């Protein structure tokens, strides 16, 4: 299956580098952002969730209305919507978008964050509830007959759903780095999301996920989604200078209370963030170009690991993860809209997903960051032969 790319849709011009306090939705910005992702052939966009943030369903429906190809990943916390209601809402969005809906589950990694919306289950209970939730969704989409449910977390009788997904079901994504996340995602998810860790640790996590899938008796395995924050410039030297400017801005914003994480924030409770901070304590740079000071600058809040370097360096770094089994790569920078356009448009960002068969036939690939569908090792060889003539022409804003 080809490698696919994911971005994240932002509803206004506020960024981590230049935050706009209490920024409201800018409808025209949101529509322009979504159209750019569609035009530059991103495959998916994640619509995030936070207790204090905009409603992802409304934002997702807006994205669906102004795009034609982009798949819309709705981030969903089970405590926010009863599963039978979510089944209909997702299927409705799927019909409105002609089969482009995806759901990404967040079990909840912070007791304090969950409590803000009335959820007082502990972490283990939240994962148990998530397991029920996914099973209910699948049954609601597939069952031809009304059905009952009676478990610790949900109880209902004779639920009948007439709102069906376009393709019979909707892809389910799960993320996390805990044993419960591996078990539930490995056994039930279509996609499993990971944050960018060094290759060794990423391989260990993928092996855990695959082992859980096998233990559950699956004949398939979840697709692996890995997230990075690329910082790219024409040369490695320029990229590192840009990276340090980015880090200085993140640190300054946090110190002045403008960052997404206050300076006095306690250590994170979720395992994924704890893992990132532990890796950061071992050194700044891992493998080819994986950079961790952005993790400590944000207290590992969400996806925060950067890939730093020239287009060649960053593309080779991502291909290392593709070789491990990652076939969904999330890329978003720190200057949200500009970076999304640069990744999609500029030759300087040139990750290629051009079909092997067409390359072998002599067709010229589009010069496009998101053109990326070689088989794993063939990608590496053909990247250079296809793009060597134009590498010297690459340029990117620093």
Describe these PLM feature segments.
Residues 1-69, 167-170:
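N-terminal beta1-alpha1-beta2 module of alpha/beta enzyme domains
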Residues 41, 63, 93, 137, ...:
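Conserved, mostly hydrophobic/aromatic
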Residues 57-73, 345-359:
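Alpha-helix-loop-beta-strand connector modules within alpha/beta enzyme cores
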């Amino acid at each position: 299956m080809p490698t696919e790319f994911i971005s994240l849709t932002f509803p206004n011009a506020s960024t981590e580098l230049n935050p706009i306090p209490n920024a409201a939705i800018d409808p025209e910005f949101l529509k322009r952002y979504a159209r750019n992702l569609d035009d530059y052939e991103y495959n998916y966009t994640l619509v995030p969730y936070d207790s204090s943030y905009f409603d992802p369903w409304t934002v997702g429906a807006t994205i669906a209305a102004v795009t034609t190809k982009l798949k819309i990943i709705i981030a969903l916390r089970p405590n926010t919507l009863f599963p039978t209601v979510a089944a209909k809402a997702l299927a409705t969005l799927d019909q409105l978008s002609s089969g482009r809906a995806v759901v990404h589950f967040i079990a909840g990694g912070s007791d304090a964050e969950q409590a803000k919306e009335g959820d007082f289950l502990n972490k283990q209970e939240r994962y148990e509830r998530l397991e029920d939730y996914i099973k209910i969704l699948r049954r609601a989409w597939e069952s031809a007959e009304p059905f009952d449910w009676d478990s610790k977390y949900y109880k209902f009788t004779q639920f009948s759903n007439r709102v069906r997904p376009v393709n019979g079901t909707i892809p389910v994504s799960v993320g996390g780095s805990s044993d419960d996340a591996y078990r539930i995602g490995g056994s039930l998810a279509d996609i499993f999301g990971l944050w960018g860790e060094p290759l060794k640790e990423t391989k260990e996590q993928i092996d855990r996920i695959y082992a859980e899938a096998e233990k559950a008796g699956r004949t398939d395995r979840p697709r692996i989604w890995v997230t990075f924050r690329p910082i790219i410039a024409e040369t490695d030297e320029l990229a590192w200078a840009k990276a340090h400017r980015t880090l200085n801005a993140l640190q300054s914003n946090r110190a002045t209370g403008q960052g997404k994480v206050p300076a006095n924030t306690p250590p994170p409770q979720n395992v994924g963030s704890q893992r990132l901070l532990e890796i950061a304590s071992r050194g700044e740079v891992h493998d080819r170009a994986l950079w961790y000071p952005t993790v400590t600058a944000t207290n590992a809040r969400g996806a925060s690991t950067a890939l730093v370097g020239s287009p060649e360096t960053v593309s080779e770094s991502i291909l290392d993860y593709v070789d491990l089994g990652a076939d969904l790569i999330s890329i978003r920078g720190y200057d949200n809209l500009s970076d999304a356009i640069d990744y999609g448009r500029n030759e300087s960002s040139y990750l290629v997903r051009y079909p092997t068969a067409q390359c072998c036939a002599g067709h010229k690939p589009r010069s496009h960051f998101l053109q990326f569908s070689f088989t794993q090792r063939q990608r590496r060889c053909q990247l250079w032969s296809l793009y060597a003539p134009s590498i010297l022409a690459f340029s990117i804003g620093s």
